[in-house]
Swiss-Prot record:
Region of interest called Disordered, as start-end residue ranges on this chain: 57-79
Disulfide partners: none
Protein name: Small ribosomal subunit protein bS21A
GO biological process terms on file: translation
Length: 79
């Protein structure tokens, strides 16, 4: 993975690198590989993730159809 450092701005380059790693799922994989996961625990985790994904898709579908209100956006203060 490669990140360009512009004008010796290392902080910005680190933020970009961290965002890229997050998108690629590197942090999740490193956490998963740090310790052995029993096959039964892996199945349970994957099943829970699948259920979570299905609920999220169903919720989004209902929101698109207008049966559920859209989530309220949180206004964050500007810098």
């Amino acid at each position: 993975m490669q990140v360009l450092v512009r004008d010796n701005n290392v902080d910005q380059a680190l933020r970009v690198l961290k965002k890229k790693m997050q998108r690629e799922g590197l942090f999740r994989e490193m956490k998963a590989r740090s310790a052995f996961e029993k096959p039964s625990e892996k199945r349970a985790r994957e099943k829970a993730e699948a259920i979570r994904r299905q609920r999220k898709l169903a919720r989004k579908k209902l929101q698109r159809e207008g049966l559920l209100p859209a989530p309220k956006k949180v206004l964050r203060p500007t810098r």
